[in-house]
């Protein structure tokens, strides 16, 4: 039986992070977690990490698509936070962001990982950006690293 498992060390990987500026008080922590995981665990040098800031989560799919199509990166990580408010805006932004990133990922030849928080409250977002529930930015980075190696193994 052949078994393919990814490892998270990818010292030569070139990784782009697309991050939303809206809710940056949360997103800064997601970015910190992602960069820490890439450098410390994945052994990716800071010179091989590109961070692209966009206005909000709605702009992430187009930006990620452009990064994928540039052929400069081995993986792209999307980071952002959408917090439910009193209107239907949350559903539109969260749904379109998720759907758009999923579409880009399925059309891509490289890993596209989802580090976008969709929460009911600011407290839930804070918990997922480095306190009680870990750091979803770091998790998205680890997933990107592992998937780089899984896809390399599959392609031979």
Curated annotation (Swiss-Prot):
Enzyme superclass (EC): transferase
One MF term in the entry's GO annotations: 6,7-dimethyl-8-ribityllumazine synthase activity
Chain sites annotated for binding 5-amino-6-(D-ribitylamino)uracil: 22, 57-59, 81-83, 114
One example of a Gene Ontology biological process annotation: riboflavin biosynthetic process
Pathway annotation from the record: Cofactor biosynthesis; riboflavin biosynthesis; riboflavin from 2-hydroxy-3-oxobutyl phosphate and 5-amino-6-(D-ribitylamino)uracil: step 1/2
Catalytic activity: (2S)-2-hydroxy-3-oxobutyl phosphate + 5-amino-6-(D-ribitylamino)uracil = 6,7-dimethyl-8-(1-D-ribityl)lumazine + phosphate + 2 H2O + H(+)
Gene3D superfamilies per UniProt: Lumazine/riboflavin synthase (3.40.50.960)
Binding residues for (2S)-2-hydroxy-3-oxobutyl phosphate: 86-87, 128
Active site: residue positions: 89
Family: Belongs to the DMRL synthase family.
PANTHER family, alphabetized: 6,7-DIMETHYL-8-RIBITYLLUMAZINE SYNTHASE, 6,7-DIMETHYL-8-RIBITYLLUMAZINE SYNTHASE DMRL SYNTHASE LUMAZINE SYNTHASE
Protein name: 6,7-dimethyl-8-ribityllumazine synthase
Name of the encoding gene: ribH
């Amino acid at each position: 039986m052949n078994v393919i498992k990814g490892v998270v060390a990818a010292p030569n990987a070139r990784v782009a992070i697309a991050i939303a500026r809206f809710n940056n008080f949360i997103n800064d922590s997601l970015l910190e977690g992602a960069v820490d995981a890439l450098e410390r665990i994945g052994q990716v040098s800071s010179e091989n990490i590109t961070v692209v800031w966009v206005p909000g989560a709605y702009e992430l799919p187009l930006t990620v698509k452009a990064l994928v199509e540039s052929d400069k990166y081995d993986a792209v990580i999307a980071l952002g936070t959408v917090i439910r408010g009193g209107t239907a805006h949350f559903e539109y932004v969260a749904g379109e962001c998720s759907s758009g990133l999923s579409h880009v990922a399925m059309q891509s030849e490289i890993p596209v990982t989802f580090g976008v928080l969709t929460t009911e409250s600011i407290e839930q977002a804070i918990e997922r950006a480095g306190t009680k529930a870990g750091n979803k930015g770091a998790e998205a980075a680890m997933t990107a690293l592992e998937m780089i190696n899984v896809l390399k193994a599959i392609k031979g």
